[in-house]
Amino acid sequence: MMNNQSMVRYQDGSYDFGSSPSPPVYSPIYRSPPPPPQPMYGTLPQYPRFLDNSHHQVMDNSDHEQQQQHHHHQQQQQQQQHHHQQQQQQQHHQQQQQQHHQQQQQHHHQQQQQQQQQLDKSYAPSNIVSELQRKIQFLEEEISRKRDTIEGLQSQVAKYEQEKQSEKKKQSRYWTPEEHSRFIEALSKYGHKDVKSISQYVSTRNPTQVRTHAQKYFLRIDRERGRKLESKESINGGADKDDDWLREEYNDEGSPTQYSSCSNSPTTNSVANPFSNSLIISSNNNNNSNSSNNNNNNNNNNNNNNNNNNININGSSGSNSNVNSGNSSPLIKRKREAVTITATQAKSALLYKDAVLAILPTSWTPSDYEQFSKGLISNIDQDDIHSLCKLIKENFLPMQSMENIESAYHAFQKAVLKQKDINNNNNNNNNNNNINNNNNNNINNNNSNNNNNNNNTNNNNNNNNNNNNTNNNNNNNNNNNNNSSNINNNNMNNSINNNNINNNGPNSPNLLSSQPQQINQQIIQQQLLNNNNNQNSNQNNNNNNNNNNNNIINNNNNNNNNSSNNNSNNNNNINNNNNSNNNNNGNNNSNNNNNNNNNNNNNNNNINNNNNNNNGNNINNNNNNNNNSSNQIIQQQQQVQQQQMQQQQMMMQNQIIPTLPMPSPQSQVLQSQFQPQQQMQQQMQMQYQQQQQQQQQQQQQQQQQQQQQQQQQQQQQQQQQQQQQQQQQQQQIYQQNLNSNSGNSSPNISSINGDFVRSPNYNNKKRPPPVNVSRPEFPVTPLSGSPSHSPAQSPHYNLNNGNNNNGNGSSNSSSYSGNQSPLGLVPSPSLSLHPPSPLITSPTSHSIRWPGPLNNTLMYDYRRMEPSHGINYVPLQQSPHAPPQQSPHFNNNSNNNNNNSNNNSNNSNNNSSGSSGINISDLNNSSDENNNSSNNSSNGSGSWHQYQATDSPTGWGMNQTITAFSNTSLSINNSQS
């Protein structure tokens, strides 16, 4: 029996594709029924349902749903009833199955026929065509719907592209007229500083674009205004076209246009222009006339006065305009005045707020001025003042009158021009100040140099007293007196020269006139008095100058010598401390002398400069006199000078003051005029001679000093030679000791193994300093008890001082003190089997420097016991028992006292030799070591004694080594404690 629910049927009628989806029970997507039987026309394809914006959802009508539900409900009821009947028949007729089997088959066959009939009806060709038509219609509608969406998207893309292009056009650097008009409106509304508000008002430009547009706009206005003014001035003509606006006459006194710059304005009442150059030039001329008579410092004050005058003039003119601002005559026809202020000046209108409000009437408030500044910058493109003020009144200041606004404009213009004039005057004043300050600084520097002369001489006195040089003290005292006298003389000479210049000016026709003669006589008398009083002082100064110059030359040589002496003294300090101290004292004296000479040099330079200045003044006087005098007077002057020169030469030769010939009346006048010059020449000659004498004396003194220094150098060289000889002698003794010990020591290492032979120059190389046991970093611990057997004398420590005792090896050498580590001192006769290996790091494989006489030799020269790879020691040739006789390498207890005394002697010797840097412990220890030699001689033969073999650490040799090492101050236990 086939299930009727497995089939999905479509009712006849119109199919609604736009309704809500049907429940999922009736959709083949959400159900999986069993496969239906094959109909007669084959299976129908399951077409997907294309719905608008609801993917795979079934659309259905409410009426159609009710019909389908009713039809399916009837089928379900029929099927349920039929099944129920079949079950009842099967239950009641089980026993009668065979009888009713045919009836059931017939009934079943009838049902199949009914079903086939129903299928034939449902799947008729007409139904299939209608279904296909519906689907085609649905697909066409779907296609049209998709086309509409595509067209909508394309239109949106086109709009987006158009908007992009329009935005690009908006962002272009070229502003449209509408944008510019909005910009002007925003500028008048918000001002030029509120860029954000302007950009929002324009609505197509960002703030940066607004800012750049405003800058270009204002700059264009300034350029156009400048061109207009230039063209206007060129039309008016005249050479002074830049100053035309300053020379123009104004209107009536009360009108606000009295400050106008219009050239065609009528002149009702001529008022002086406060900005004209005539007033400024006249004031400058007056001040300059004053400054010519005064010093350089007065120029600065005069320039400042100019500025003050300008300010007062401007202020007075502004106050008059304020008082009479209301008396303007409206009947006068005047031409519209051009706007002369620039946009940059209008933008800075708030800077002139206080200056303008001070001129304007009291009815103006700061807020009114702010509105005025906004209107000024927003309407700066206006060409004439009347239209500018009219726009300001209409848009910004409706409560103020046109006259007040025009007066505010002129006040602002006046403040701008006043600031410009102040800036120009400041620039000029700065230039003048720089020149005047330079002159004053030069004068002050010269005065400071003179003051330094006095200070330097006082310092020289102190230094010379420390050195106890009487000659230098006398010279310095003279320098003090002479410096003071020079200053006075220079001042007097300068005053005299100034008087001569004024009197001998171009106004005086002749030198023989009455007034110049009287003045010259007074001047000559003053000069005679001053020169007579100060001749000696000037001579002393010149002499001192010459002496100091010689000192400069000689002291340079002395400095070189001192530098060489210092180097030699440093070398001597290493060897002899006493000699180096003496040399240092000498060097200190020389250094003090050099300091004094340097101070004298400063004085010489300054004094010479003063003398040159005086000479220059005299030359200037001569030039003035020559310009004012005739040729005859010049010739007479030359004759008089020649006579005076001859007389001075005679005085110098004979040292007798001759009588002067009586001059003529004309020559008397000339002599009275030029007598100061003659006296100056005489003083110069006397000073020159004295300078030469002092130079000779100083040269002699310097030669003596050089000789003394040479003697000191020779003494130092002799001391160095003596020290070198002593060092050579000590080295010879040391080498002799080494050579004498080489015969008694162990076999040469070089004969056993040639690879370890050192170069002959090995001893000459620089080595680290010896380890001094007496130093505080190596504390010597006292022995608690009697030390163990230690090698009192060993052939390895054999350093004879040229004395061999029968060749037994028991020579006078330094004993083993107990403070030395004996690890490497146990000899091994089988050295050929165990050569010294410097590459192995063992306690004795590196170079160790021992105190005492062994400080110049390395431990490579001695036999040593080296550990090989474990605790295996060098095998010796005897049994581990005690030796049959005592070894010469170890002393008895009786020798320990000698060892302690040797330690003390070594310490004392090291301390004493620390000053010279040379250890001479060989000589000092020789006397202490005689006891050791006697003890060693009693031990038997001095030849090598063969030890017993120490194959284990418990051997006798190892025990002796350990006990000896434990008693030393360099042991591990003592170092840790």
Swiss-Prot record:
<keyword id="KW-0238">DNA-binding</keyword>
<feature type="region of interest" description="Disordered">
    <location>
        <begin position="1"/>
        <end position="122"/>
    </location>
</feature>
<dbReference type="GO" id="GO:0005634">
    <property type="term" value="C:nucleus"/>
</dbReference>
<dbReference type="Pfam" id="PF00249">
    <property type="entry name" value="Myb_DNA-binding"/>
</dbReference>
<feature type="region of interest" description="Disordered">
    <location>
        <begin position="531"/>
        <end position="650"/>
    </location>
</feature>
<keyword id="KW-0805">Transcription regulation</keyword>
<feature type="region of interest" description="Disordered">
    <location>
        <begin position="422"/>
        <end position="516"/>
    </location>
</feature>
<feature type="compositionally biased region" description="Polar residues">
    <location>
        <begin position="783"/>
        <end position="797"/>
    </location>
</feature>
<dbReference type="InterPro" id="IPR017884">
    <property type="entry name" value="SANT_dom"/>
</dbReference>
<feature type="domain" description="HTH myb-type">
    <location>
        <begin position="167"/>
        <end position="222"/>
    </location>
</feature>
<dbReference type="GO" id="GO:0003677">
    <property type="term" value="F:DNA binding"/>
</dbReference>
<feature type="compositionally biased region" description="Basic and acidic residues">
    <location>
        <begin position="52"/>
        <end position="68"/>
    </location>
</feature>
<dbReference type="InterPro" id="IPR001005">
    <property type="entry name" value="SANT/Myb"/>
</dbReference>
<feature type="compositionally biased region" description="Polar residues">
    <location>
        <begin position="944"/>
        <end position="960"/>
    </location>
</feature>
<feature type="compositionally biased region" description="Low complexity">
    <location>
        <begin position="75"/>
        <end position="118"/>
    </location>
</feature>
<feature type="compositionally biased region" description="Low complexity">
    <location>
        <begin position="738"/>
        <end position="754"/>
    </location>
</feature>
<keyword id="KW-0804">Transcription</keyword>
<feature type="compositionally biased region" description="Pro residues">
    <location>
        <begin position="21"/>
        <end position="39"/>
    </location>
</feature>
<keyword id="KW-0539">Nucleus</keyword>
<feature type="region of interest" description="Disordered">
    <location>
        <begin position="229"/>
        <end position="331"/>
    </location>
</feature>
<feature type="region of interest" description="Disordered">
    <location>
        <begin position="872"/>
        <end position="960"/>
    </location>
</feature>
<feature type="compositionally biased region" description="Low complexity">
    <location>
        <begin position="422"/>
        <end position="504"/>
    </location>
</feature>
<dbReference type="InterPro" id="IPR017930">
    <property type="entry name" value="Myb_dom"/>
</dbReference>
<protein>
    <recommendedName>
        <fullName>Myb-like protein I</fullName>
    </recommendedName>
</protein>
<feature type="compositionally biased region" description="Polar residues">
    <location>
        <begin position="505"/>
        <end position="516"/>
    </location>
</feature>
<feature type="compositionally biased region" description="Low complexity">
    <location>
        <begin position="798"/>
        <end position="848"/>
    </location>
</feature>
<feature type="compositionally biased region" description="Low complexity">
    <location>
        <begin position="276"/>
        <end position="329"/>
    </location>
</feature>
<feature type="compositionally biased region" description="Polar residues">
    <location>
        <begin position="254"/>
        <end position="275"/>
    </location>
</feature>
<feature type="compositionally biased region" description="Acidic residues">
    <location>
        <begin position="241"/>
        <end position="252"/>
    </location>
</feature>
<feature type="DNA-binding region" description="H-T-H motif">
    <location>
        <begin position="195"/>
        <end position="218"/>
    </location>
</feature>
<feature type="compositionally biased region" description="Low complexity">
    <location>
        <begin position="887"/>
        <end position="943"/>
    </location>
</feature>
<feature type="region of interest" description="Disordered">
    <location>
        <begin position="738"/>
        <end position="853"/>
    </location>
</feature>
<dbReference type="InterPro" id="IPR009057">
    <property type="entry name" value="Homeodomain-like_sf"/>
</dbReference>
